[in-house]
């Protein structure tokens, strides 16, 4: 690309991600390993909507600029934070379970291999293999829900952008 204006796009989005990190906190930026480890090591500490929204925005802006940021680790972290938030509604169930379920549910549509997503989370979190079946079911549900929603959104897009004839 010979135009210099294209060099400013990553700089602008990089500054936006930096502002997101300042406003939403340290757990909203980065690869996601720190966030995931924090959720798994201290599940009683409930993350808020602020961290979730900040991580979601920083993941989008990093992906738009085609910067090295990935989708796998940030989506696992996003699922862990979502599970942490969701666990605040259920006091009788351990928060760690919700974090792991969120990790599987967010990873499956990204990788497009549901059973492998469940295996990756079971192996990386070192939980008991007796949970593998339920995590596989959750992974399959999120995978097929993603396929279903893609079909709906593509139909909506066709209807919205269909050329009108006069």
Could you tell me what each predicted segment is?
Residues 1-166:
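Alpha-helical transmembrane segments and immediately membrane-proximal extracytoplasmic
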């Amino acid at each position: 690309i010979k135009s210099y204006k294209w060099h400013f796009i990553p700089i602008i989005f990089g500054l936006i991600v930096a502002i997101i990190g300042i406003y939403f906190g340290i757990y909203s930026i980065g690869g996601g390993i720190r966030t995931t480890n924090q959720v798994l090591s201290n599940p009683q500490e409930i993350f808020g909507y602020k961290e979730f929204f900040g991580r979601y925005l920083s993941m989008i802006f990093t992906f738009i600029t085609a910067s090295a940021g990935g989708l796998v680790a940030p989506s696992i972290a996003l699922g862990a934070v979502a599970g942490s938030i969701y666990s605040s509604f259920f006091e009788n169930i351990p928060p760690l379970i919700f974090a792991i379920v969120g990790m599987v549910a967010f990873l499956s549509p990204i990788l497009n291999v549901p059973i492998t997503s469940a295996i990756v989370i079971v192996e990386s979190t070192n939980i008991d293999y007796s949970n593998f079946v339920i995590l596989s079911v959750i992974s399959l549900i999120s995978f097929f829900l993603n396929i279903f929603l893609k079909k709906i959104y593509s139909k909506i897009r066709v209807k919205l952008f269909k050329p009108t004839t006069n």
